[in-house]
């Protein structure tokens, strides 16, 4: 089991639930826009939020933002260590630094000392796009071992400064390399791991990459917190993260819809019905399994683990629960009958 750190009031690692993170795409110095986006993210289920801090103005906005939100705030720092010091003074809940560009050891020590004084954890954020040049030369490019060496080198640097309140992130856009690096870290250290696939892309492909790269690791017991990085509204990152956690069997945050792919036995127009059920389930928060099956022959049996479901036939279908048939229902009433049963659960 990984060791535990506290990011504000959220425990990360040490057996705590895998937490969902996102990152604002507003200008951090625009306090109103940033706060409004964070409030939307909170409502969607985000539990830790990160903001970019490229300027002193952005760093000085931290206290005003923190005063109006309800989840921990993380500062993303590149190049200028003094911005990390300002954020620490402003009450930030965690600081993310990149070992490839933060600078000399004295600068890292200054950040570590400031965080140690205030109980602020540091996330070592290694990115394939900004690996140290000597590692790129040594390994001939961005490899899993290069990512791990960068992270562990910075862990040692922080440890030398007497700092141990650490989590680690190693991200690149190539899923197999990403997964290999995280597996290696999982074997080499007990610091909590922040999972993600960087530059994953737009939702269509980015969710797929993240489902494999993050979900695969979660299924192996690797990872303590995650962010799904998408070229989209950050709320979509949170929705995708919740779905990945649910699909991996880690956290239930609502209903799970199962449906068959249809075949020649299907005697009704099932695909639009499945989509209608999916649409209506978005307003349901119950941790239940709902089935939409293609035929009355196999449907109830194949979906016997579902809390409730429907199986279509010619002109009518079956409503069932836990594999037991409840009644026959005319096809045009199937969806309404299904949701009447869901309301009873």
Show which residues each predicted segment covers.
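Active-site mouth loops of central-metabolism enzymes
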Residues: 15-33, 52-54, 71-79, 135-148, ...
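Alpha-helix-loop-beta-strand connector modules within alpha/beta enzyme cores
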Residues: 55-77, 110-122, 182-193, 277-281
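Catalytic alpha/beta core domains of metabolic enzymes, predominantly
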Residues: 126-127, 135-282
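Hydrophobic or amphipathic alpha-helical targeting/insertion segments
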Residues: 82-123
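N-terminal amphipathic alpha-helix/helix-capping segment at the start of soluble metabolic enzymes
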Residues: 1-23, 116, 279
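Hydrophobic faces of well-ordered beta-strands that scaffold small-molecule active sites
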Residues: 18-24, 49-51, 73-77, 95-97, ...
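Glycine-rich, proline-tolerant flexible connector loops at the mouths of alpha/beta enzymes
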Residues: 25, 30-31, 42-65, 96-104, ...
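Glycine-enriched alpha-helix->loop->beta-strand junction motifs that scaffold or abut catalytic
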Residues: 68-71, 88-95, 116-119, 186-192, ...
């Amino acid at each position: 089991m990984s060791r535990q750190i506290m990011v504000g009031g959220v425990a990360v690692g040490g057996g705590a639930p895998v937490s969902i993170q996102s990152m604002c795409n507003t200008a951090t110095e625009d306090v109103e826009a940033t706060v409004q986006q964070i409030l939307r993210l909170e409502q969607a289920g985000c539990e830790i939020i990160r903001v970019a801090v490229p300027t002193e103005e952005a760093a000085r906005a931290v206290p005003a933002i923190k005063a109006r939100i309800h989840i921990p705030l993380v500062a993303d720092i590149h190049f200028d260590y003094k911005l990390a010091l300002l954020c620490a003074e402003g009450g930030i809940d965690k600081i993310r630094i990149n070992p490839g560009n933060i600078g000399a050891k004295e600068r890292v020590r200054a950040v570590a000392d400031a965080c140690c004084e205030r109980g602020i954890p540091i996330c070592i954020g290694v990115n394939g796009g900004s690996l140290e040049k000597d590692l790129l030369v040594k390994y001939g490019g961005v490899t899993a071992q290069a990512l791990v060496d960068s992270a562990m080198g910075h862990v040692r640097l922080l440890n030398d400064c007497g700092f141990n309140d650490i989590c680690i992130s190693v991200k690149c856009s190539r899923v197999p390399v990403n997964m290999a690096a995280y597996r290696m870290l999982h074997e080499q250290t007990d610091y909590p791991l922040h999972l993600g696939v960087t530059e994953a892309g737009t939702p269509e492909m980015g969710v797929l990459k993240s489902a494999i790269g993050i979900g695969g690791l979660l299924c192996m017991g690797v990872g303590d917190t995650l962010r799904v990085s998408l070229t989209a509204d950050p709320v979509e990152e949170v929705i995708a993260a919740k779905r990945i956690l649910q699909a991996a069997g880690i956290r239930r945050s609502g209903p799970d819809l199962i449906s068959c792919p249809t075949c020649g036995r299907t005697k009704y127009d099932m695909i639009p019905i499945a989509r209608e059920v999916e649409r209506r389930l978005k307003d349901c928060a119950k941790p239940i399994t709902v089935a939409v099956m293609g035929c009355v022959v196999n449907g109830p049996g194949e979906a016997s683990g579902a809390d409730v479901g429907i199986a279509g036939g010619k002109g009518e279908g079956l409503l069932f629960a836990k594999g037991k048939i409840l009644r026959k229902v005319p096809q045009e009433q199937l969806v309404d009958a299904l949701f009447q049963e869901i309301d009873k659960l």
